[in-house]
Amino acid sequence: MNAEKSVREPLPRGFWVIWSTVALDMVGFGIVAPILGRYADRFGANGFQVGLLFASFSLAQMVFSPILGRWSDRVGRKPVIVISLIGTAIGSFITGAAGALWVLFAGRLIDGASGASVSVAQSAIADLGAPKQRAKMLGMLGMAFGVGFVVGPALGGLAALGGPHVPFYVAGVLASINAVAAIIRLPETKTAREHQPVETHEHKHRNISSWVVIGFFSTLPFAGFEATFSLFGGSRFNLTEAGTAAVFLAVGILMSAVQGGLIGPLTHKFGSLPLLRIGQVFVAVGMLFLGAAVVWPVLFLALAFMVIGAGIASPSLTTLVANSAPEAKRGEVLGFQQSSNALARVIGPPLAGLAFDHIGVGAPFTLGAGIYLVAIVVASRRSLHSAV
């Protein structure tokens, strides 16, 4: 009865403003990501340079996320989110106006360095909500990612009808509007809750390190999946670009449904740590099935396992990080987690590509399942006394 009541508790004031800020930010990202490779090709970029272009965003994000997270702990969440959105707008405009490949890299580096808005938004959500609400709220924040990845590519495709550079200008305009809206409507959450005594014992810091390691080994194979699934689908199932886009659309919708509708009730029933382990097992099993899939039913089953597992595990892990972090350093800790995930997104795609080229079509996913087992082992063996 108490669990049911807690699930139905109203969300704190300001939540939907933060949610809409992240959703609009992800729409802009969704506009750019699918077309960036073809856009770079116009500047004579080869495949390796396109890979570096994608990696440059994650590298900049890896470096600056902890810095901006620490800054948000000192000056507040709102100014850092606003500055990040302004940086995203500048990076998008530079990318759209690029006349040479190096300018394109500059735009992506600026955009990546400004990519701390997500981890700072997660910190703002954690500031607003009581620990028992965080999993639900962070899951719903994850739903904003799904909305962005569904709406963004469609909007980018329409914008591209006006020219290859237009989608980047559209993304820049959206980020500018988002920044203005954040200045007007976004609440400052850093002072919304009274500072409470927090554990600062060494074991708690070890717990945070464990969560970051788990996040890295969870993100690494999933980033490889995102990078090589189109190659796998084309080789084994004759999927066209439109077919691959439809698959990712379905993935985004299912992920949004899981994170927006299921994670709250499931967390209140089972707890974040058990859900993390369940989600990890689902993803590992899904990747094994995907690597072996040669018929459509197995493909759909594998993708369902992966998406449901990731939809459960990701917000559960973020909740555990947020609950383990001292309140005064929550932004820095969540920024460090995002930095670790960004590093995995730098390493994962080229590793998966090498496995595809030199081992076999399904190798990225079979090996990915093995890598994911490392995350499962760490989650199972570490003594995580602060888990809730």
Question: Where are each of the predicted segments found?
Answer:
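Juxtamembrane intracellular "pre-TM" segments in multi-pass secondary transporters
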Residues: 2-12, 187-217
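Short amphipathic helix-loop junctions that connect adjacent transmembrane helices
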Residues: 34-47, 228-243
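Helix-breaking motifs and short loop linkers at transmembrane-helix boundaries and internal kinks
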Residues: 44, 76, 97-102, 292-294
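Conserved MFS/SLC helix-loop-helix module at the cytosolic interface between two early adjacent transmembrane helices
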Residues: 62-99
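Helix-to-loop junctions at the C-terminal end of transmembrane segments
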Residues: 65-75, 258-272, 356
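Cytoplasmic helix-loop-helix junction between adjacent transmembrane helices
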Residues: 107-146
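Helix-loop-helix hairpin linking two adjacent transmembrane segments in secondary transporters
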Residues: 141-183
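C-terminal transmembrane helical hairpin of 12-TM major facilitator-type secondary transporters
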Residues: 273-317
